[in-house]
Amino acid sequence: MDAQEKKYDASAITVLEGLQAVRERPGMYIGDTGVTGLHHLVYEVVDNSIDEAMAGFCTEVVVRILEDGGISVSDNGRGIPVQIHEKESAKQGREISALEVVLTVLHAGGKFDKDSYKVSGGLHGVGVSCVNALSEKFIANVFKDGQAYSMEFSKGAPLTALQVLGSTDKRGTEILFYPDPTVFSTCVFDRAILMKRLRELAFLNRGITIIFEDDRDAGFDKVTFFYEGGIQSFVSYLNQNKESLFPTPIYIQGSKRGDDGDIEFEAALQWNSGYSELIYSYANNIPTRQGGTHLTGFSTALTRAVNSYIKSHNLAKSDKLSLTGEDIREGLVAIVSVKVPNPQFEGQTKQKLGNSDVGSVAQQISGEVLTTFFEENPQIAKTIVDKVFVAAQAREAAKRARELTIRKSALDSARLPGKLVDCLEKDPEKCEMYIVEGDSAGGSAKQGRDRRFQAILPIRGKILNVEKARLQKIFQNQEIGSIIAALGCGIGTDNFNLSKLRYKRVIIMTDADVDGSHIRTLLLTFFYRHMSALIENGCVYIAQPPLYRVSKKKDFRYILSEKEMDGYLLNLGTRESRVVFDDTARELEGTALESFVNLILEVESFIIALEKRAIPFSEFLDMFRDGAYPLYYYPPESGKQGGNYLYSNEEKEAAVAANEEAAARIIELYKASAFEEIQHNLNEYGYDIRHYLHPKGTGITVSTEDSKTPNYTCYTLKEVIDYLKGLGRKGIEIQRYKGLGEMNADQLWDTTMNPEQRTLVRVSLKDAVEADHIFTMLMGEEVPPRREFIESHALSIRMSNLDI
């Protein structure tokens, strides 16, 4: 579009109505006040920047989680207008800037002005003002027309007037906000959730750069999302680690007149050799999880185009075999995206697009492009058709296998499916089913359970890897058949019915070893691929059986993990100890000693983060130069040896200036501020980070109240931690459980099944795209990506966690 169509100033800001209800009923505007609503605040601010990009005025967005938990979103767009808004000023009887209008008045913004934004993701116009209303602290910085402006708010009310900060070369808007803890159940942002959405936006808006940073974690590298190929790159990303039937995704793009203006439609699609259908649809960058007219139009056109090609080229295999849309979409990965001037969504959460004109536009554009593509690429078309017929034959075979399974289940209903031991309660809301690894553990679980509401289904060995199997084979697998029959809700897209689920909680309980982890992963793969609604509705849980039982005299406790065990031993060892620094005679005990120990643990966390980047700590220490440790690592090009350490931002900038590709390859080893704080705190005790491994010269003497334990001098910080853990082990008996079968029924009940004491982890789907990527890589046919993943993460594994 022409960037000069209309000047974007205060006159472009249109007000529809006023604000107060947001704080009283926040759920009406952001969905809820839990984790979902919290992250929705960030999306609302980012959407404004994306709208600028869609209008052609913004190329970069930076999203940062601040060290103190706040959020910063900045862009290089035009900047929110700051002039006096005449209409609202007259209405309120005072001079009010357009910036204040945008941030304090509901349904105010440039998106209602058709010349300022042709298309916008924020349909309801409540976005940024809603974020302001629900923030304890909110700061807007605007860089516009050579001047920098700032304004601060709290809970939607201005704390300062619009301030002019001075001249600037920057342009754009920066929003900083801190969610109000009196509104939200949690104010802790999950970077995985944010990264999922930012990745989506970068794919959907070709050419925009979105940078994500997390200042809370010294070991986290900033992530840059940039995809020149747009949704074609999105499909390639989704098909990564899968065997694609042809190299480049088919791209569909077109624009046609709709009821309210031009509708821009685009789609990208590619088949792979797998059996799962994966289609994501979007309207104005908003995920439409329930589809809508754009997806229906695309799917209809796809089915017609394939059937038409088969008919016109006499490729039908059999008159008796009829093809369905499901057959055509087996192994299909597709992205469908539409830009609509006036989108009509069903409900505030915008899950489904309802514009009828969009459906016909999507169908027409898709049909034209696909028909032409198949005619111009007969080899690809034949490959697709061959797969479609194999899918149809497999569907018929799976249908027969399903019917056989249903008949067999009906005949065997008197003894229940598999080895299921059912509960007495019949209300699914009150019932739970444990899927237990092995007959031995299953026996203990049966004896230890509360038979009123707990059912037990033992499974034998590793179940089928459904990532590599068609439905026909899945139905023939005895263990999976038992799970399907026990749950009672069916399987797949067409035959799954959540209302028929017999247990509201499905709990996976496996051993705390490698085999147990493998079985758990196989089960999760099955649920994700064929009963994903169970995960989406929070019905799948993972039991947390203890790894250790520690006892001291008559007292005992259970410990879930190696990390918890280390903390427990360290706490015991520290509790009755005293340390003396030999060079200064400084003494520490009680809370003062705990603070010193926690500081050493911070050093250990720093080392772990460093070694996750494949930088051994000893090598890092050896690179100390001119009073400084390296801040960045510049790895060599693929297949070459060497690599350079960079000690400052200036050295990094010089490397990027010499080679633009360096920007993507240079690794930030740590956050300088966090490292400096650790060093400063160590200096308070007369130590440095290198003393974690290398002796200082003088030692730290540890003594205890136990007269039978002699004093011991440690010469490194690591030795202090190891010795205190050793003291913690004295006088206690430690039993490590390798399997559930090692616990008797009472122990299993007390630790893993008693609702009053147990720990369950609910399986959630924060990022469906990344979940698909991981399941494909770890459980799919392709070996090289799995090997690369294992090799790249090998340094992240602590030897103490290996089950050898």
UniProtKB/Swiss-Prot annotation:
A GO MF term: metal ion binding
EC assignment: 5.6.2.2
Record InterPro entries: DNA_gyrase_B_C, GyrB, HATPase_C_sf, Ribosomal_Su5_D2-typ_SF, Ribsml_uS5_D2-typ_fold_subgr, Topo_IIA, Topo_IIA-like_dom_sf, Topo_IIA_B
Main location: cytoplasm
Binding-site list for Mg(2+) 1: 437, 511
Gene3D superfamilies: 3.30.230.10, 3.40.50.670, Histidine kinase-like ATPase, C-terminal domain
Top-rank lineage group of the source organism: Bacteria
An example Gene Ontology biological process: DNA topological change
Residues covered by the Toprim domain: 431-546
Function statement: A type II topoisomerase that negatively supercoils closed circular double-stranded (ds) DNA in an ATP-dependent manner to modulate DNA topology and maintain chromosomes in an underwound state. Negative supercoiling favors strand separation, and DNA replication, transcription, recombination and repair, all of which involve strand separation. Also able to catalyze the interconversion of other topological isomers of dsDNA rings, including catenanes and knotted rings. Type II topoisomerases break and join 2 DNA strands simultaneously in an ATP-dependent manner.
Subunit (UniProt): Heterotetramer, composed of two GyrA and two GyrB chains. In the heterotetramer, GyrA contains the active site tyrosine that forms a transient covalent intermediate with DNA, while GyrB binds cofactors and catalyzes ATP hydrolysis.
Comment field (misc): Few gyrases are as efficient as E.coli at forming negative supercoils. Not all organisms have 2 type II topoisomerases; in organisms with a single type II topoisomerase this enzyme also has to decatenate newly replicated chromosomes.
Descriptive protein name: DNA gyrase subunit B
Encoding gene, per UniProt annotation: gyrB
